[in-house]
């Protein structure tokens, strides 16, 4: 019942690691209690920083057919022996990098791993590998034959037991890498291996296994309703903008979408037949606009104040549209009871974590913009406890916490919190929001937030597209389809909006759009200038037609049981045909 424990000794490093293997009804588990790891040469600076268990388990032979299922973004496949020995092997941290560290050059823009799982698929079998404990500190590695001085194709998780940071030194000393002090924070790490026997095994088997794990042991309950399609609409209220007053440049809160204008946008869509809508309102409070910690739920006077806000919420309630006022409490400025010299996250290098902006041309720090302080996870319980209370008092029914449902980081100062500690704290915050009666919309939701999310927005439609990948698959969507309703990334944010729309409905996503009332020219030199594409008048007609087209997909609960037979461009727009009719099922107007 207790399994078997095998002790691995690394005499040169003075490290001993006992690993417990246990065979259950449908899986094999490998686990390590980190308190049992013995380190005898710590005084010499030798400590355990990373741990890989069963690194070659399920490896593909040089003459074997099969592939790895990688949950990068929407999902990707790496086929065995794909001849890409000269490309970089795959390595990525689950839930993204620890943003506490601040690189001097801009990191590559890639998708994240949102689920601590990978799959190995061969001709007549598959294996699903799931991190059961320690998912906040795990890295996924994959390499095809020839990439890692091995003739085998391998994929495995590695646990980062101690985080690292860099001291940037001047002169001839170079940069110094420093690691976390003290004992390992993560109490236990555990991985499960679920085998599946299937004559025609595929990544669908991996998705189904992980889906069952979430429903049976991950605390996830089905919330999606069959045969419904909703439009997800992101509105952006205000921002800080520099104006010249008597020749003096002054930065003021400026409205880009007031509460009355938001009502106008929504009512315009409703008038064109959009009957199911999920509305997310960003930057709707003074704190949200100015970048301070935002938890008071007080509508900004710049956008129309409480009177106009109440008119908006009354209208949305009357139309039965779901409303999620959003907050973004990742970086912050002093104010509202939180101060940068007290509440900023401390890096492993013992310095403040100041998030910098990067020059678009060269990727180095943009010195024309001030750095922003990263909010300490030690404040989260208070911040979101107050937010839940204030949202309820304001009569709101939903909340969006921004990227706090997909991003985790540690605080290595007095708080002494690792990433997994932050994950646990965030889950208690989600519970506080739910227990106050609020519905929670998760922005690009990571697995640790699945049990608490009522809806998910901004689901990735593609992978990072690394050279070692062979093709993208909708793995994320397959796992969640029929469990939690979700939307894809904003269709109008794409350079090819028509292709983005087709990809969205093909992967089972509800259509999503970003909209701002102000003209694109008004956004210049503001924090909202990246939404230059989102002027509402340009997209209203196209967006209004999208839910009807997406209904083709939602008419069946199976993601792959419908068929778009052809797509045709015409003078009026994009026509979508199905196998059931010779007439267009829907036509999207040209945008």
Question: What do these predicted regions represent?
Answer:
Residues 54, 268, 272, 315-319, ...:
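Structured segments of extracytoplasmic/periplasmic soluble domains
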Residues 120-154, 183, 332, 336-396, ...:
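Active-site-proximal substrate-binding groove within the catalytic cores of carbohydrate-active enzymes
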Residues 273-277, 319-323, 395-397, 436-438, ...:
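Short, well-ordered coil/turn segments that N-cap beta-strands
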Residues 229-314, 318-382, 406-410:
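Aromatic-lined carbohydrate-binding/catalytic grooves of carbohydrate-active enzymes
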Residues 196, 200, 252-255, 302, ...:
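Hydrophobic alpha-helical scaffolding
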Residues 1-256, 263-277:
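Carbohydrate-recognition beta-sandwich/jelly-roll modules
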Residues 8, 34, 55, 281-283, ...:
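Glycine-rich, histidine-containing beta strand-loop boundary motifs that form or position
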Residues 32, 269, 316, 402, ...:
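Conserved, mostly hydrophobic/aromatic
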């Amino acid at each position: 019942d207790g399994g078997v424990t095998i002790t691995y000794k690394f005499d040169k490093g003075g490290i001993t690691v006992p690993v417990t293997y246990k065979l259950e009804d449908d899986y094999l588990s490998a686990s390590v209690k980190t308190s049992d790891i013995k380190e005898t040469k710590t005084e010499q600076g030798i400590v355990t920083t990373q741990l890989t268990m069963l690194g070659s388990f399920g490896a593909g032979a040089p003459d074997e057919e099969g592939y790895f299922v990688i949950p990068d973004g929407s999902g990707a496949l790496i086929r065995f022996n794909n001849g890409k020995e000269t490309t970089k092997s795959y390595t990525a941290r689950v839930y993204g990098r620890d943003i506490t560290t601040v690189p001097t050059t801009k990191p590559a823009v890639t998708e994240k791993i949102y689920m601590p799982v990978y799959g190995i698929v061969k001709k007549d079998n598959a294996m699903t590998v799931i991190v059961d404990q320690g998912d906040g500190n795990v890295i996924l590695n994959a390499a095809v034959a020839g990439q890692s001085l091995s003739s085998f194709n391998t994929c495995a998780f590695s646990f980062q037991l101690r985080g690292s940071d860099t001291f940037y030194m001047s002169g001839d000393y170079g940069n110094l890498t420093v690691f976390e002090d003290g004992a390992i924070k993560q109490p236990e790490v555990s991985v499960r291996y679920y085998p599946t026997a299937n004559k025609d095994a595929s990544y669908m088997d991996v998705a189904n296994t992980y889906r069952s794990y979430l429903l049976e042991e991950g605390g996830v309950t089905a919330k999606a309703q069959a045969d419904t399609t909703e439009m997800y609409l992101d509105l952006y209220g205000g921002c800080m903008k520099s104006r010249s007053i008597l020749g003096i440049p002054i930065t003021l809160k400026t409205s880009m979408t007031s509460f009355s204008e938001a009502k106008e946008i929504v009512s315009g869509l409703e008038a064109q037949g959009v009957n199911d809508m999920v509305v997310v309102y960003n930057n709707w409070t003074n704190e949200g606009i100015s970048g301070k910690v935002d938890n008071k739920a007080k509508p900004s006077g710049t956008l129309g104040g409480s009177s106009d806000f109440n008119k908006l919420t009354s209208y949305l309630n009357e139309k039965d549209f779901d409303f999620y006022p959003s907050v973004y409490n990742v970086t912050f400025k002093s104010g509202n009871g939180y101060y940068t010299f007290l509440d900023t996250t401390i890096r492993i290098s013992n310095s403040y974590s100041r998030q910098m902006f990067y020059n678009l041309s060269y990727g180095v720090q943009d010195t024309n913009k001030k750095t922003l302080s990263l909010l300490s996870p030690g404040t989260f319980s208070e911040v979101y406890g107050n937010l839940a209370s204030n949202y309820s008092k304001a009569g709101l029914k939903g909340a969006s916490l921004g990227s706090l449902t997909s991003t985790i980081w540690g605080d290595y100062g007095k708080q002494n919190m690792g990433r997994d500690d932050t994950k646990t704290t965030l889950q208690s915050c989600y519970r506080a929001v739910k227990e106050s009666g609020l519905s929670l919309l998760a922005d690009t939701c990571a697995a640790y937030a699945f049990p608490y999310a009522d809806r998910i927005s901004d689901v990735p439609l593609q992978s990072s597209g690394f050279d070692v990948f062979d093709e993208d698959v909708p793995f994320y969507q397959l796992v969640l389809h029929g469990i939690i309703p979700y939307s894809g990334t904003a269709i109008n944010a794409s350079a090819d909006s028509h292709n983005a729309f087709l990809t969205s409905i093909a992967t089972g996503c509800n259509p999503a759009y970003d909209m701002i009332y102000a003209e694109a020219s008004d956004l210049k030199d503001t924090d909202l200038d990246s939404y230059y594409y989102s002027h509402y008048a340009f997209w209203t007609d196209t967006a209004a037609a999208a839910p009807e087209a997406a209904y083709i997909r939602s008419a069946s609960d199976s993601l792959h049981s419908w068929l778009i037979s052809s797509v045709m461009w015409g003078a009026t727009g994009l026509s979508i045909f199905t196998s059931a009719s010779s007439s267009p099922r829907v036509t999207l107007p040209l945008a």
